[in-house]
């Protein structure tokens, strides 16, 4: 059984009175533990696809399945709980809380879920060290570069050990060496935790490093 299944998904927007079809009958299976990259031209709908996959945006038609559960047949509270328990997100904007340190930002999802405080902070610190920010744990977002803030956001997305990681350009603001460190971290958490990751990227090196590569063009997803 696939971990994630997308069946005949459509999504459209209206811009200046004109309908724009972003997803046109997309069907796809993603297996547990797969590392998947998604490439495509700017404006092709990669972020929209990620949002539908992550239940942040409902499709106009079609179905998203997690194992044997039809996600969008749940009510709003059930969808929110499913998302919080199952999916870690890394967005193009880091959305860190400015009044909290890097360590506090990373630990916060675990604390909200009432995990042990000492364990939550210890794992948050470990993740920050693994993204190369062990020396920046006490700095607030305003004291970090864009690339550093994005790495904090990645650590935060991993702190609950989600089954699925959805990342939108996680290396977009990083230099090549730091970007390679992020690639390595994704491979490590995949090996250690069996995490399934779908990564939207323009970085050809990152895309090629993933065992499975997809391309979104013309509203359709194909193997790249």
Swiss-Prot record:
One of its GO terms (biological process) is lipoprotein localization to outer membrane. Signal peptide: none annotated. Its EC number is 7.6.2.-. It is a peripheral membrane protein. Residues 4-224 form the ABC transporter domain. ATP binds at residues 40-47. One of its GO terms (cellular component) is plasma membrane. Its main location: membrane. Keywords: ATP-binding, Cell inner membrane, Cell membrane, Membrane, Nucleotide-binding, Translocase, Transport. The keyword Transcription regulation does not apply. It is found in: Cell inner membrane. One of its GO terms (molecular function) is ATP binding. It holds the Pfam family ABC_tran. The complex is composed of two ATP-binding proteins (LolD) and two transmembrane proteins (LolC and LolE). Belongs to the ABC transporter superfamily. Lipoprotein translocase (TC 3.A.1.125) family. Part of the ABC transporter complex LolCDE involved in the translocation of mature outer membrane-directed lipoproteins, from the inner membrane to the periplasmic chaperone, LolA. Responsible for the formation of the LolA-lipoprotein complex in an ATP-dependent manner. This is Lipoprotein-releasing system ATP-binding protein LolD. The gene is lolD.
